[in-house]
Amino acid sequence: PFNPSTRIAFDISKPGFVRISIFNSLGREVSVPVNEYLNTGSYTTDWNASAHPSGVYFYKLESGNYSETKKMLLLK
């Protein structure tokens, strides 16, 4: 659980365009903290959810043919 911000860590194995989208429990996209070309390496991005209500959120990382979705819990 986090309040009001969380850090998302991720690794990129091949250079390319990377997008991280954050969705609420209804599937509505509420934020896109990463949307850029990145080189190989380890990265972090912070998401401040102070403008959003408590609840379950999901982040989806997309890079090339790779896609991963993880759950986050915002407790205020």
State what each model feature region is:
Residues 2-76:
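C-terminal outer-membrane/trafficking sorting elements
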